Amino acid sequence: MVEPIYGGNIGSVARVMMNFGFKNLVMVNPPLTGIDAMKFAIHAKEIVQNAKIFKSFDEMAENFDLLIGTSAEIAGDKNFIRTPISSAKIGNAVNTDGNIGLVFGREDFGLSDKEIEKCDILVTIPTDKTYKSLNLSHSVAVILYELVREKNLRGANLKKMKLANKTERDVMLEKFTELVSVFELGDFRTRLIRKTFKIVTGRSFVSGRECNTLTGVFRRSRELIEKQKKENV
């Protein structure tokens, strides 16, 4: 939860988490008083008490292999940052073995564009366009329901894949960017391609092995292209 405004919502979210079997609550700059949070948590007070607190979004993000952001505000195909998938499509998250964070924004205006850009996936909950925003705890309930539902559907057949960690993903993205830069497309197009690639790989929940394989391909491709360029000079 990023900068939640009301302690009551923190407690309600903790209660929802306990309903669905989740225990690890993380908050960025929560309100100083925790009285309402404990009051609304009912039997989930322990989740509030054990919550991890971070001072900034970036500090929080360093602790996760993959971040799934949430937003009621979506955009068309031209805005890559706010082009989400439906909440019903995040089921693959239960098929991975890694540290995944679900990121919920402020009650009044949600996550900023900069924060969304730092997430690997953006998810939205389909609602009526006349009133798109859900109460924070209701949003959490819908997302957690989808995850638990998918886990129960897969049941004993669920085989978890080792998710690429943050370092592996960052290295892969950097090597991809270096490869794209060889084509001298300009800063704007390079950044756009980089963002697109990050979104695609985020939605794919790439494994560590897949990530390292792609990293090797990008690195070798860049080396060969640069070698060919030098030979043609």
Predicted regions mapped to residue ranges:
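Post-transcriptional modification and biogenesis factors for structured RNAs
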Residues: 1-233
